[in-house]
Amino acid sequence: MKLSVYIILSILFISTVFYEIQFTEARQLRKTDDQDHDDHHFTVGYTDDFGPTSPGNSPGIGHKMKENEENAGGYKDDFEPTTPGHSPGVGHAVKNNEPNA
């Protein structure tokens, strides 16, 4: 019983000692005069947060998005699948089937 009381008191003492220590390697930043944010009150409801939109088509709000008219065929060579077990450029040599001249 006495041993468990000593263990609990030791844990509480150690935790109170290390409570104020910051375990970080980051540099502590100083507060400058230009960055004094104490006088600003951040509250919800500023009227300048969002500007009104013009009437008409608002994509994403009940209207369809504008279709992307890019030609997907122009990008068909961007990805070429490889056979299983061979990934050229990732530690493997590129196999060349042409005979050496």
Swiss-Prot record:
Residues 27-48, 64-77, 93-101 form a propeptide. GO terms for biological process: cellular response to nitrogen starvation; nitrate import; regulation of leaf morphogenesis; regulation of root development; root development. Induction: Triggered by nitrogen depletion. The mature small signaling peptide is generated by proteolytic processing of the longer precursor. It comes from the Eukaryota. Keywords: Apoplast, Developmental protein, Hormone, Hydroxylation, Secreted, Signal. GO terms for cellular component: apoplast. One of its GO terms (molecular function) is hormone activity. The modification Hydroxyproline is found at residues 52, 55, 59, 81, 84, 88. Residues 1-26 form the signal peptide. Residues 29-42, 64-79 have a biased composition (Basic and acidic residues). Residues 29-101 are annotated as: Disordered. Expressed in lateral root primordia and in lateral roots excluding the meristem region. Also present in the aerial tissues, such as leaf petioles and the shoot apex region. Extracellular signaling peptide that represses primary root growth rate. Modulates leaf morphology. Regulates systemic nitrogen (N)-demand signaling. Mediates up-regulation of genes involved in N uptake and assimilation pathways. Interacts with CEP receptors (e.g. CEPR1 and CEPR2). Belongs to the C-terminally encoded plant signaling peptide (CEP) family. This is Precursor of CEP6. It comes from Arabidopsis thaliana (Mouse-ear cress).
